[in-house]
Amino acid sequence: MSQRVKIVNLLPELLGTYGDQGNVVTLSWRLSKRGIDNEVINASAFEKLPADGDFYFLGGGEDDAQVAAVELLRNGALQSALKNGAQLFAVCAGFQLLGESFPASNNRTISGLNLLPIKTESASPRSVGELLCESTLPIGALTGFENHGGQTKFTDRLQPLGIVQLGNGNHLSEKCDGAVTDQIIATYMHGPALVRNPALADYFLNRHGDLAGKLNEIEDSVFKKLHAERVAATK
């Protein structure tokens, strides 16, 4: 790829509660290890959100921050980027706000961005703990940590990211986690997810048309060891 790859970390001051920015760091690292020029753009709430990124990231956050974030994202920059071939990775609150609606404080229901056919409602008990899935993608087991009160249901046909082996995932009764479309991978997995799951990180990078099939193997044994340790810890 001749041009610099742009990784856009959307609204980190609002959606950066659980250290999910580590996903952005690991994407940049994996590109740099392959000699692929890249830059991370921390797109602040006080700036115009860029529409020319290659990869976008939405992290987790608290209720009021999530509401503020979805209002800022209604400006269409993310939507335009996805239409132009960008890829989005979204975690927890970032996952929820991509749907039709999600719950907020004071019993409010907030309209989402309608980028995914999902709806999230408040539920009890809160889902907290290790989350282990078998991915629906050809990358094996996925490991992470979930911490969410919302329960997410699909409102139309949609591929989950993983089938839950341990934990709750999207919904207490449905035993799946996240969602996958041509432009979006979403999950409830913190960890950060792309640090714990190097195969998922490379799969995500490979989805961009300019990078597909061009990612050579790299020395990342420390991340593969972390993945194996976290999977083994759930057994």
Which positions does each model-derived feature cover?
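Cysteine-nucleophile active-site neighborhood
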Residues: 62-139
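Short, solvent-exposed coil/turn elements at secondary-structure transition points
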Residues: 13, 46, 119-121, 150
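A secondary-structure boundary/capping signal
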Residues: 11, 91-93, 116, 148, ...
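Amide-donor transfer/coupling interface in amidating biosynthetic enzymes
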Residues: 2-3, 9, 122-235
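N-terminal beta1-alpha1 cap of cysteine-dependent amidohydrolase-like domains
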Residues: 1-83, 195-235
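Structural motif
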Residues: 55-59, 89, 188
